[in-house]
Amino acid sequence: MLSIAKRVFWPYSSRAKGASVHKIVKSINALEGEMAALSSEALFGKTGEFRKMLSEGTVTLDDLLVPAFAVVREASRRVLDMRHFDVQLIGGIALHRGMIAEMKTGEGKTLVATLAAYLNALESKGVHVVTVNDYLAERDSEWMGKLYSALGISVGCITSSSSDEARKAAYNCDILYSTNNELGFDYLRDNMKFSRENMVQRGYNYAIVDEVDSILIDESRTPLIISGPVERDSSLYGKVDALVRDLEQEDYDIDEKSKTAFLTEDGALKVEQLLISHQLIPEGSSLYSAENIIMMHYVGQALRAHKLYFADKDYIVKNGSVVIIDEFTGRMMDGRRYSDGLHQALEAKEGVRINNENQTLASTTFQNYFRMYKRLSGMTGTAETEADEFLGTYNLQVMQIPTNVPVQRVDLDDDIYCTEEEKYEAVIDFIIECHKRKQPTLVGTISIEKSELLSKLLTMRGIKHSVLNARYHEKEAYIIAQAGKPGAVTIATNMAGRGTDIKLGGNPEMLARNELAGITDEEERAKRINKIIEQAKHDKEIVMQAGGLCIIGTERHESRRIDNQLRGRSGRQGDPGLSKFFLSLEDGLLRIFGSDKVRGMLKRLGMKRGEAIQHKWINRAIERAQKKVEARNYDIRKSLLRFDDVINEQRKVIFAQRNQILDRETYDLVPFYSNLNCDIVSRIIKEKYCDLGHRETAEELSAEVTRIYGIELDIGALSALETREEVIAYLDKVADDLLKKKADGFVHKDENLWDFAARRVLITSLDHLWTDHLAALDSLKCGINLRSVGQKDPLNEFKIEAFYLLEKMLSRFYEMVIQKLAHIELEVQQQPDDGMINLNNSTSQLFGGIARNDRCPCGSGKKFKHCHGMIKV
């Protein structure tokens, strides 16, 4: 019912919004003359006026939208020599309203972001502009930073190489440019820090996400994980890999849709015998017995590595390491590793060094990270196909922004061939036709392997070309700069689909940067620049007459958005262009997800070799296959989100508790200890207290108190207590007195030492147990779907079990903290002249992880080496 209502009413609501938007644009345009008449000092001083009005509460951001946008437009004209078009103003309004602005390639999304970023920066609460890679973050912050700086708005940029000091300074700027990965990992790292002073982020006010579909949808299935090595025998991966290589096709079944692999009955018996013969499991035992269950894990991952993950498609081997390739962008994902032992299995398969498995220390998802922002917006060229998901997951509506100039690109029907070989022959012939008429061609492939196959075929035909894939990513900017030159042929994976504009005739700025490297003579530089600009203009005319940039797709992607992104490289800003896809029945999408009816019909037609079919019915069938995959992937993302929402609620509780502990100014630990003691005493009484007057009961109580607190009780005095309440009061007093005595001993040496040590104990204990808890939740999540066999809802079961595990973890946390604090001892060294205090071994972990030049977490303001860093552990 809801989906029907959306289809009926959504167009109406869009038109209504459009009408109000055009009125706002008209108001902004009405101020253009007034702003143009202002002096630079008066124009750039508007920021101070706006901020004063906001601080006085006389206006809201919505009230300032029209004058603020007018100021940005005029400032941009003066500083950047770029004036916002009316359609760009509409995009800025959509962003400010917390919507997704769908804008075609080349429509100036980078400039659009300045409107909403400036307006929201006036509150001084922080605006985050999120991009997909470091290059774009640096480029946009430097480029648009000139505009912001002129308006008195501070701008920061964070990349993977930024230091903690630089990160903190950047987060404190009015506007921050960074990548989704850096923001997400900073959030996790902040919640692993040992002092608030070392945290870098300051809140989640407003974010503009560029390429929003890539970040919030494509990457949402991949969690952000900070991990540490775990002790496990990695050599088994190599031993099992050698055995799996001997398996034949009848020994296993694979499901390419879900990327899972299973041993058949015969295959399991074969693997069992191989494991026994290689002394990896005991003779006479079963592969499926409890003691060998871990071996099933190794075998399963080795099978997946060999049969479902392929070099130059899913990953590449670079400098002796297995590096994952992003399926959506075609870029290398340095630092990312497959989880659950799959990466180790791939390393064994490729014969490179097998690294240890990792344990999750902290994790989150982009879905839950970006939902922390009070207001969220985004930009992309392709969002409408995922509008339902944006609305359902992020409460983001999509506004389609019209192009400034009508799109001139011609999208031809797909050609479908029987075999891959015939398809590539047709692709090469089509490229040669374009090349002859000087029409530049961008050929999109889905993998490195396919891009290099095409490159080989073109070389055999004597066609000069460039290849852009994860192997040659360093040359990306230069290759793209030349991709629009007359007759240029560029073969690319999905890397060419994001954040880059292919200008007809070539990009003179980028070409000049490469040609002028090393030339210092200003006169010579000016002469070369003019020559490059004139050549680019001449080349553009040639390309325009040839029909503009031609896009050739060699395979349909699982997502229609990726295909649309490839097409969107052509026809920018009203330029002419052409796009065409060449497909075969052997392509992955048609083979795995296409209907048998389509394949059967094409085969019955008796197509001759080299003959292609073009029909709208076939195009619709392919679109149905893509929709089927998109719906399946959406279901996977929804399921992952529902489970992660459960974990996220616990994550928020633990992180909030952690931040409270770190807050020395407002969080008093004394009541906290007292409450912990009460909880522990209550638990001891519940478990050990049986009957009054029994010496056995008193001895059991005493033994438990000794285990936790390290002190022995007077059995006689304890036995003499007559009521349960008296026992509780007695034990409470003993516990409180012990901790008070410990605290007094520390404070006597240094008034801040006990507080520092106690908070350190709390944090390290919480972090340790949270890590174990995440591992337990991962294990629970892996098998929870089996509960559906018993007619139980896996999600509800997960919620119940996860809550039980959290209660268990907190109970262990309370006991661990009290036990550690109760056993801390201070020992003064025999040589007091060096001013050091020695703590016993039980507390040596308290001071790990703090650099000597960091501020001391005790809050003194001194460097750690001059404060508690003098404590010798």
UniProtKB/Swiss-Prot annotation:
Pfam families named in the record: P-loop_SecA, SEC-C, SecA_DEAD, SecA_PP_bind, SecA_SW
Binding site for Zn(2+): 856, 858, 867-868
One term under GO cellular component: plasma membrane
Gene3D superfamilies: Helical scaffold and wing domains of SecA (1.10.3060.10), P-loop containing nucleotide triphosphate hydrolases (3.40.50.300), SecA, preprotein cross-linking domain (3.90.1440.10)
SUPFAM superfamilies noted in UniProt: Helical scaffold and wing domains of SecA, P-loop containing nucleoside triphosphate hydrolases, Pre-protein crosslinking domain of SecA
Main location: membrane
InterPro entries recorded: Helicase_ATP-bd (IPR014001), Helicase_C-like (IPR001650), P-loop_NTPase (IPR027417), SEC_C_motif (IPR004027), SecA (IPR000185), SecA_CS (IPR020937), SecA_DEAD (IPR011115), SecA_motor_DEAD (IPR014018)
Stated family: Belongs to the SecA family.
Name by which UniProt lists this protein: Protein translocase subunit SecA
